[in-house]
Amino acid sequence: MRVFFLQRLCGFYGMMFVNKYFLGGLRMAKLFYQGHGSFRITSSSGQVIYVDPYAGEGYDVPGDIILVSHQHGDHNQVQLCARKPGCRVISNVEALEGGRYNTFNIDGIVIEAVQAYNKNHDPKECVGFIITVDGIKIYACGDTSKTEDMSTFASKELDYAILCGDGFYNMGLEEAAECARLISAKNNIIIHVKPGELFDRELAEKWDAPNNVIIEPNQEISL
């Protein structure tokens, strides 16, 4: 009765609001961590984005977009991902062309390619991504160390920075914390934290970054 009264009181747009928040529940974008450098983002409307598929489980949800930061085998196993018809695969090849970092708008999801590089990763063959979904800005660094681009990220007002920190193939935890402070995202998540392992919580807890959000494999959070 109360819901019906609110619908009548608020009119058409009010009815849409009531149906969404009182009847259907509030839908939110989510992030599911698979392990190593792999994770999945789902928008509030059900659009699914896989990032650097390789590790763990949870590839059975049909994807709309698959992002590959570079062509190392622990980041590019796109065959693992279930796909919706018309699923778009964007790898470093499409994202970085002739020295130009491209931006894609796919049904309202914006994918901006940015720099990624270190001594183990050629800057011409690697990218990171800034993903905007439901107005939430998420930086997925790929395999990298500190880059020149990062000095501009604070102005982007990122909601999440997802950073690597294994200290072997990529920057270590100390440099990753330095990057987190430079980027100034509202929340920071460390992944790709130990070579050959899905995750290491003890190392993640030692990460001295502001607003450190720890996510373990097979854990999902609301963004």
Could you tell me what each predicted segment is?
Residues 36, 70-75, 118-121, 192:
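Histidine-centered active-site/metal-ligand motif
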Residues 147-223:
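Cap/insert and terminal regions of metallo-dependent hydrolase folds
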Residues 41, 70, 111, 143, ...:
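Divalent metal-coordination and catalytic microenvironments
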